[in-house]
From Swiss-Prot:
The lineage of its organism: Bacteria, Bacillati, Actinomycetota, Actinomycetes, Mycobacteriales. GO terms for cellular component: plasma membrane; proton-transporting ATP synthase complex; proton-transporting two-sector ATPase complex, proton-transporting domain. SUPFAM superfamilies: F1F0 ATP synthase subunit C. Keywords: ATP synthesis, Cell membrane, CF(0), Hydrogen ion transport, Ion transport, Lipid-binding, Membrane, Transmembrane, Transmembrane helix, Transport. It comes from Mycolicibacterium gilvum (strain PYR-GCK) (Mycobacterium gilvum (strain PYR-GCK)). This is ATP synthase subunit c.
Length: 81
């Protein structure tokens, strides 16, 4: 097997993980910003704002783990040798 294919798989896996990490960081930041803004506007609604925040953060992180699964598929399913 050509080493270029293995190198391409590793580079592609790294790009997948980098994109997922950047996306998760941006998504968590936007959700956190919305939470802080909502609590600053209405402090009494703090309890009602935490549930959608944690659901949103969980979905954003789930998307990151889906990226992790695709990275593992691309890197480890590449035939070597």
């Amino acid at each position: 097997m050509d080493p270029t294919i293995a190198a391409g798989a590793l580079i592609g896996g790294g790009l997948i993980m980098a994109g997922g990490a950047i996306g998760a960081g941006i998504g968590d930041g936007i959700a956190g910003n919305a939470l802080i803004s909502g609590i600053a506007r209405q402090p009494e609604a703090q309890g009602r704002l935490f549930t959608p925040f944690f659901i949103t953060v969980g979905l954003v992180e789930a998307a990151y783990f889906i990226n992790l699964a695709f990275m593992a598929l691309f890197v480890f399913a590449t035939p070597v040798g």
